[in-house]
Amino acid sequence: MDQEQTPHSPTRHSRSPPSSASGSTSAEPVRSRWSPKPEQILILESIFHSGMVNPPKEETVRIRKMLEKFGAVGDANVFYWFQNRRSRSRRRQRQLQAAAAAADATTNTCDQTMMVSNSLPHHSGSDLGFGGCSTSSNYLFASSSSSYGGGCDNQSNSGMENLLTMSGQMSYHEATHHHYQNHSSNVTSILCPSDQNSNFQYQQGAITVFINGVPTEVTRGGIDMKATFGEDLVLVHSSGVPLPTDEFGFLMHSLQHGEAYFLVPRQT
């Protein structure tokens, strides 16, 4: 009975990552400290972007054989790389969704602020309770005219009093209107400071790309490869196509926002 139960004991570990096709255990310790080379990363990223995000065991073995041309690698290394790559992809997707939601919230807040500032009432002097200014002006003018001899008749005094009253009301109305306009513009600029700044990066032509898996901001248009990355490196798209440069070392085509690229040594 003991001999019949012994072969079934290893089945509890059936969920472990695939082992190397050679069957040797010497290649397995590499997976814990494996650092893929740029050529290996290029192959893995190309396969991942082609839609194969969770390759089966047979494909894992085939991918491992392709990667072995550039360095030591085991099946477990390939298995864990795709596992980590899926996690990074999901995390990046969540970050992009959160950034889009924050941008929408900022836009809605600014729209509401503009509506509130535009709906602020513009009161004249009489609406704010300063209608007594006309009475004061009439009284001062009447007192002044009587003190200096009262040489004018009642009709001329009435005309001058009306003129002073209208002038005072117009001056106060203009000052009040100017105050509310300044207040509205200040509220809008304080609560919505990012309207102009949010477009600054786009106007400058800055885009974000992933170089060797790291988000990097670059300028839109031709990039000086020699000054930026050195003379011994070539920029390759995740599809495996190298990016051409002109005789001065500038990229002939602009990088695409959100795309993945890799720096690989120049083949001599």
Curated annotation (Swiss-Prot):
GO biological process: adventitious root development
Low complexity: bias regions: 16-27
GO molecular function, one term: DNA binding
Chain spans, region Disordered: 1-35
Top-rank taxon: Eukaryota
Cellular localization per UniProt: Nucleus
Record function comment: Transcription factor which may be involved in developmental processes.
Protein name in UniProt: WUSCHEL-related homeobox 11
